[in-house]
Each structure stands twice: as structure tokens, then as C-alpha cells.
Amino acid sequence: MEMEYIRVAEDENEEPMEIPSEDDGTVLLSTVTAQFPGACGLRYRNPVNQCMRGVRLVEGILHAPENGWGNLVYVVNYPKDNKRKMDETDASSAVKIKRAVTKTSDLIVLGLPWKTTEQDLKDYFSTFGEVIMVQVKKDAKTGHSKGFGFVRFADYETQVKVMSQRHMIDGRWCDCKLPNSKSPDEPMRSRKVFVGRCTEDMSAEELRQFFSQYGEVVDVFIPKPFRAFAFVTFADDQVAQSLCGEDLIIKGVSVHVSTAEPKHNNNRQLERGGRFPGPSFGNQGYPNSRPSSGALGNNQGGNMGGGGGMNFGAFSINPAMMAAAQAALQSSWGMMGMLASQQNQSGPQGSNQGQGNQQRDQPQSFGSNNSYGSNSGAIGWGSPNAGSGSGFNGGFSSSMESKSSGWGM
């Protein structure tokens, strides 16, 4: 008996597929499910009354109608539950894909020139794609631009492209990015990666082609002069993050990929650490063999004792400031007058601190003892009573006898 083919389709309106029958004229259900996974039977439309009629199924075997298979188109039957689940899955996937494609956000444009209008902004960004909204923020009182604005595109791919580069608008470089709604301490996900251990024969185009296999590359930067590393920027931050920590082979050389730390993170750390990062040099100095009544002491007078003291604990100074202070002390006494004035405002001073302070050794100090053979007028530093020995006698005579200066307690 010659093999017969019957026409089977998933839907009446679709193009049918021919399926072979067995020698006895029956069709195995396994033959149908091989072409239509999940199928559980066949049905056809009765030519007489146009009603759908099912094909008899016995133990996995489909039997032909009374008049044979004929030239009819047989439609595949699916279990209702499976059909419903498949439809829901397809609909859900379609919605997710649609949302992913159409989701766009307002982008903030920073650094706009004062003269830029909303029409100027729209004309510029229209070169990238369809613009559905532009706004230049203005001062409510003056009506002048605040130097930033917002733009929204109709297409998500256009938005990604615009965010991946800087823009020259009316003669000024501007940045276009998503408004940062995160807290200052929360790190932003970077789309840029650092590629270390590069060789000089690796060009920017070769790096672009290599990394394009992982995702869309929007920029490749190799610093000049060559320093054995490069930066690669992706359109998607997830691609960049997935490559961080990987060792990749480019032109037979192993390169290491890590996160490119944004500059603003370093600035933020500097702000947390203070203006001068590093250990504080307040309460530190050059120890000497004898105690001092203050961290920075200066005792001057014509055969006068005592000492005027000044504590540097209130000042957080670094080595550069310390060196500058030392140079100023050696070259001019004007610096001492300034420090004395600051002492009177911020720190304790006394005319006779010697007894109490001499009993404890403070290793962080500067001391300077100067004697001049002069009894001329005093530029007062310390107590008004010069007899107490706590003063700064600034009279200089031609018959200077001696000067002893030392850094000590």
C-alpha cells in the first residue's frame, strides 16, 4: 500500500505540514507530537455542517474518518492547561520585552551655557533621535537659566548613546546622565573598566573589537604616553561589572580587568579625611632634654627669665606647615607676633607657667630662647609685667651680645 500523507496545521489559518501515515492508513500520535510538541490529538472541520470534528484516538493511534483522510486540513489539539500556560508565558515575555525596549527616563544635562534656550537644546539632541521633552531650569525671580536642564528621548537606544559621550553645546562641554537619586555614600555602578597589563602593540580598535563580544563598546581610551593600561566604556553597566576581576587573553597576552574608580569617589574620600590627608602633626615636635612650659615657647629678654608658652595642640599641622614655620622663625620674628596673637585668641597662655608645666614632659614642641644685650622697649608677648620674665622684648641694639636659639621642649 502506498504511503499516504495527511495535512496537519497548528491553526486553520496557518500553512499545513504533511505527515506520513502507517501502512494500515492510521497515523501514530508520536508522529504528530514529533512535529508539534505537546499535541494530544487532531480535529477537522466537517464539510457538511462546518462544525469541528475530532479524530478517533485509540492507544496512541489516530484512525482516519469514514471517508478516509482525504484532502482536509487537520488541526492539532493541545491540552487546555498547557495551552493557557503557553499563552500566558508568551504574553508575559512580550510585555517584558516591550517594557525593556520602550523604557526611557528623563536625563539631566549639566553645564549648560547661560544663553542656551530650550529650542537650542532640542535642536542639538534631535540629531541623535526623536526628542519628546526638553526643559531648561530657570530662576523663578530673574528668569535666567540655572545652567542645567532635562531631556527625554523616545527610543531607549538613543538614550544610551547620548549618555555614553560628552556634548559640546553652544561652545561648552556638557554632561548628560541619569539624575543621581542615590545617597552620597552609595557608589554608582560604573560602565567603565580598567584594563591592565596591556602591551604597546594593542590598538584602541583591537581592544574595541575584542570587548565587543561581551556587549556594546562606546569608548576605548589608551593614555599617552603609553603606561600599559587602557579604559573601556560599555553601554551597559552590567556588562562592565560582569568583567571586573577577570583575566582575559588579548593577542596572546593576559590582561586584567577591574573597575575604573570615578574621580568623584576619590574627592569624597579626601573630603572625609580633611583638607590634609595623613596623620596629624598637632602635639608633635622635636623632643629635647629639658621640659618646656608650652608646645611652642619663645623666651626673650635682656637677662630675663621666665617664658611665654603657646600650645600647638589646637592646630593640626602637617610637615609642610611645620617646615614653613621653622623657616619663618629663623628668618623673621614677625611670624612669632602673628602666632602670639593667635595664641591669645585660641589657647591658654601665662606669664609664669614654668613651675606646673616643667614637671611634665611634653615631647611635642618647639622652643626658642633668645637673649639680647638690650634694655630697650618691649613688644609685649605674655603678661604686661615685664618683671615676671614672661615677655617678648623686641628692642634690638647695636651691641647685641649673644643669641642662642634651639628647638626644644
Swiss-Prot record:
Residues 260-302, 341-409 are annotated as: Disordered. Keywords: Biological rhythms, Cytoplasm, DNA-binding, Mitochondrion, mRNA processing, mRNA splicing, Nucleus, Repeat, Repressor, RNA-binding, Transcription, Transcription regulation. One of its GO terms (cellular component) is cytoplasmic stress granule. CDD domains: NTD_TDP-43, RRM1_TDP43, RRM2_TDP43. Residues 261-274 have a biased composition (Basic and acidic residues). The RRM domains can bind to both DNA and RNA. This is TAR DNA-binding protein 43. It comes from Xenopus tropicalis.
